[in-house]
Amino acid sequence: MDYKTQQFIDRLNKLDFSKMYEGDFFLTWEKTDDEIAAVFTVADALRRLRENNISTKIFDSGLGISLFRDNSTRTRFSFASACNLLGLEVQDLDEEIGRAHV
């Protein structure tokens, strides 16, 4: 493991982000400073891996479910790109269809 990768791991080990596991990211204003710092640290680590042609696919298979209220192409493309980066297939849900089954 190279020095820079170890720095990311060391930085994450100093942060408390344990409450994020199996949670959502809807209410970002409720996240702690440590949780936000952990998100940015992981993003930096993923960027470094990608820049060095190291696979960032942490999933062999799986779905990234999207349920967006707006029709923003930029938002949908960003989500699809992130899912692809991690090895997930995107499944778009229509909000109107989702309500019919609730």
Task: Mark where each language-model region is.
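Positively charged, low-complexity intrinsically disordered leader regions
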Residues: 2-77, 81
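Anionic-ligand anchoring segments at beta-strand to alpha-helix junctions in alpha/beta enzyme folds, i.e.
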Residues: 75, 80, 85-98
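Conserved small/polar residues in nucleotide/adenosyl-binding loops
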Residues: 100-102
